[in-house]
């Protein structure tokens, strides 16, 4: 169970880092938002899911 928690935290940190870089690039590029809207929403949905997963796994470990 601990390894699953550690992998979930690593995935959350990696997703946060990717979104931290990619979202401003999408907004700064001309025509970036309209063509990359689905990718940004998918990344955000993944991030929200990982936040809940880390919270659930944390409650099981503690």
Swiss-Prot record:
The gene coding this protein: psbZ
Record GO biological process: photosynthesis; photosystem II stabilization
Locations listed in the record: Plastid, Chloroplast thylakoid membrane
Species whose genome carries this gene: Vitis vinifera (Grape)
Record's GO cellular component terms: chloroplast thylakoid membrane; photosystem II reaction center
Keyword Oxidoreductase annotated: no
Function in brief: May control the interaction of photosystem II (PSII) cores with the light-harvesting antenna, regulates electron flow through the 2 photosystem reaction centers. PSII is a light-driven water plastoquinone oxidoreductase, using light energy to abstract electrons from H(2)O, generating a proton gradient subsequently used for ATP formation.
Name assigned to this protein: Photosystem II reaction center protein Z
HAMAP family tied to this protein: PSII_PsbZ (MF_00644)
Keyword set, alphabetical order: Chloroplast, Membrane, Photosynthesis, Photosystem II, Plastid, Reaction center, Thylakoid, Transmembrane, Transmembrane helix
Topology relative to the membrane: Multi-pass membrane protein
Major location category of this protein: plastid
